[in-house]
Amino acid sequence: MLAEDSYLIRIGRLSYLVAYLEWAVLGDLPHIPGLPPDLGVRKLAGMTTGRLGQTLQSKKILQQVADVDTQDWLRRSGELLEITARDRNSVLHARPATVDGKQMLYRWHPEGNQVFAVDEAWLEAAEQRIRDAIRELSVRRVATF
């Protein structure tokens, strides 16, 4: 038995927001002067959300960027992508379960100290975190078009 359509739509919306945040970062990179070749979109596009976040924050990369505002934007982009990756992974690595009589995803990863229902409240909070990240990066944008 599947979860209700409204719940499944929220899962889809969360997935879309993750992709939107990733592209908000990747799409700006070609328009930021002075970036090293390792930050080429072709090199980064296949990375997971978490790996992309780690790459953008790496000292090796940041040391190659002269502009302080660009360094800050890259670092913060990486941090926000890593936070988003945790939410993304909580959904994608969850399993269907019946909780309080409703079908929903249940994140069960005891070694990672992640055991919880991916319920409406959790989805709302995760969506809000990602929306806030998108807004923050938009305000701090360093790309020139």
Language model features with spans:
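Short secondary-structure subsegments characteristic of cysteine-rich extracellular domains
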Residues: 102-117
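Short, charged/polar, low-complexity loop and linker segments
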Residues: 1-5, 64-70, 111
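Short Fe-S-cluster ligation motifs
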Residues: 122
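Generic alpha-helix initiation/capping and coil-helix boundary signal
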Residues: 70-71, 126
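Amphipathic alpha-helical interface elements
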Residues: 1-61, 79-86, 90-94, 99, ...
